[in-house]
Amino acid sequence: MGMDRSDMNKNLAQMLKGGVIMDVINKEQAIIAEKAGACAVMALERVPADIRKQGGVARMSDPKMIKEIRESVTIPVMAKVRIGHFVEAEILQSLGIDFIDESEVLTPADDSYHIDKKAFKVPFVCGARNLGEALRRIGEGASMIRTKGEAGTGNVVEAVKHMRTVMDEIRRVKNAAKEEIMTIAKELGAPYDLVQYVWMNGRLPVVNFAAGGVATPADAALMIRLGAEGVFVGSGIFKSENPEKRARAIVMAAAYYDDPKVLEEVSEDLGEPMYGLEISDIKDRYAERGW
């Protein structure tokens, strides 16, 4: 019997495991990312640090720019749409994007509903702060989950919090008695069958990446040690002094996350990292967008 579209999309996302996905704003950056060993790139007009700095409404990027990036690399290309904006998603699907990120980094288009991702052929990535959010997005059809963190800050603390929360809640479900599953599903606001999957398997039904504030090789290794199966790096690379070297170092850190000697070597002489923000100083908390 043939594999259904949902399983195919989950398998596509599985192929990115262990990798680093980098935000790029043009084809030159995309080529640097691919040469550094990125497993995919995220095409967008402004990295989160600039969206945060400039303010205003952040929307889907220009399809022309996305096409130029897609034509410049051989690795998968992702692009972001606003939460709930299914027409932006239809446009990206039409232009042949590899993955769509329904992203809280862009200004939400709908404050009540997320996109029905099962209506699309292209796989979706979604952010989550906890297990309930993750399972709701998977229930809607997401093929990959990432922490929300706080994008554009260069501060990994929120991503750490979200990853620890998800992993702690997975352990709680795994250790529960079978008769507790329905109550847990009610508490989490998550589909019963997905809570049951977590109870039986001790993990999410899809890959779980880290995102939001990853700025150094050590940050990438930390997130993988905490349970992430790969890492998104947004502003952290191309807002730093030496993007090529930092990109390579973060890819190495994701591969050798358990080897302090390698991490020491790749962390040396990277130049200035991106400017970081204290979370308490931020006006807009992107992670609070969506539910």
From Swiss-Prot:
Its assembly, as annotated, is:
In the presence of PdxT, forms a dodecamer of heterodimers.
Gene assigned in the entry: pdxS
GO BP, sorted A to Z:
amino acid metabolic process; pyridoxal phosphate biosynthetic process; pyridoxine biosynthetic process
EC number(s) recorded for this UniProt protein: 4.3.3.6
Its source organism is Clostridium acetobutylicum (strain ATCC 824 / DSM 792 / JCM 1419 / IAM 19013 / LMG 5710 / NBRC 13948 / NRRL B-527 / VKM B-1787 / 2291 / W)
Pathway involvement?
Cofactor biosynthesis; pyridoxal 5'-phosphate biosynthesis
Which reactions fall under this protein's catalytic activity? aldehydo-D-ribose 5-phosphate + D-glyceraldehyde 3-phosphate + L-glutamine = pyridoxal 5'-phosphate + L-glutamate + phosphate + 3 H2O + H(+)
| Record's protein name | Pyridoxal 5'-phosphate synthase subunit PdxS
Return the similarity comment. Belongs to the PdxS/SNZ family.
